[in-house]
């Protein structure tokens, strides 16, 4: 495992002129432990900044971590026995980011055993402006993507996931789908939800898991990035355990 100290060095001064190796497909055992990963990121992430001020450093920090540890920030898999459609957070790179999505997918695949997992990232800008304006159009676009996946993969168990602004996008997508369509969704899992406390429209609350940490300003409707908003990787196993019975 490559040293996490390298990550801190690369992020020092917010400079990224180094040649970054292409991410490789690796097993999670080659990643840092979740606690090590989060501890090191906490040293370099813009804790206490607004999302507007923090955007570039969030993107660069996740890019560096992805390159160092072979964590894929982009997923466009074919459908599996179970398929996750995941919307990343504001300023997260790729189409699934690094902070939350990959850890959840890995935990879910482990929990599924021999069943196949397909992951598809939601291709939306994840911009600061979209976050501040409610990401409405992105929700409409995700709703269309959901319908497309259900049509092309009628036998898959579809799970919707989102982190930060991505949770907002999932809420907006559900609001643009009727109950009959949403009934085909097996589970919804949201991390760091800006709409915390608001139910997912047209969907069974018993099949919804919303994880919001104490002290997460984003979950309180704010725009300040505090440490509790960056640590949802530690909930990956819990989220996977929630999903598995719903896709069995």
UniProtKB/Swiss-Prot annotation:
Biological processes per GO annotation: carbohydrate catabolic process
GO cellular component annotations of the record: extracellular region
Keywords: Disulfide bond, Hydrolase, Secreted, Serine esterase, Signal
Post-translational modification: The 2 disulfide bonds play a critical role in holding the catalytic residues in juxta-position; reduction of the disulfide bridges results in the complete inactivation of the enzyme.
Reaction(s) catalysed by this chain's protein: cutin + H2O = cutin monomers
EC number: 3.1.1.74
Functional pH dependence: Optimum pH is 4-7.
GO function terms (MF aspect): cutinase activity
Residues of the active site: 164, 216, 229
Subcellular location, record wording: Secreted
S-S bridge residues: 55-91, 79-153, 212-219
Propeptide regions on this chain: 18-28
Regulation: Weakly inhibited by n-undecyl phosphonate (C11Y4). Activity unaffected by paraoxon.
Sites marked Transition state stabilizer: 90, 165
First and last residue of the signal peptide: 1-17
InterPro entries per record: AB_hydrolase_fold, Cutinase/axe, CUTINASE_1, CUTINASE_2, Cutinase_monf
Positions of the UniProt region annotated as Lid covering the active site of the uncomplexed enzyme: 31-70
Chief location category: secreted
Domain notes: In contract to classical cutinases, possesses a lid formed by two N-terminal helices which covers its active site. The lid opens in the presence of surfactants to uncover the catalytic crevice, allowing enzyme activity and inhibition.
Functional description taken from the UniProt entry: Catalyzes the hydrolysis of complex carboxylic polyesters found in the cell wall of plants. Degrades cutin, a macromolecule that forms the structure of the plant cuticle.
Family, as annotated: Belongs to the cutinase family.
Name under which the protein is recorded: Cutinase
Species this chain originates from: Hypocrea jecorina (strain ATCC 56765 / BCRC 32924 / NRRL 11460 / Rut C-30) (Trichoderma reesei)
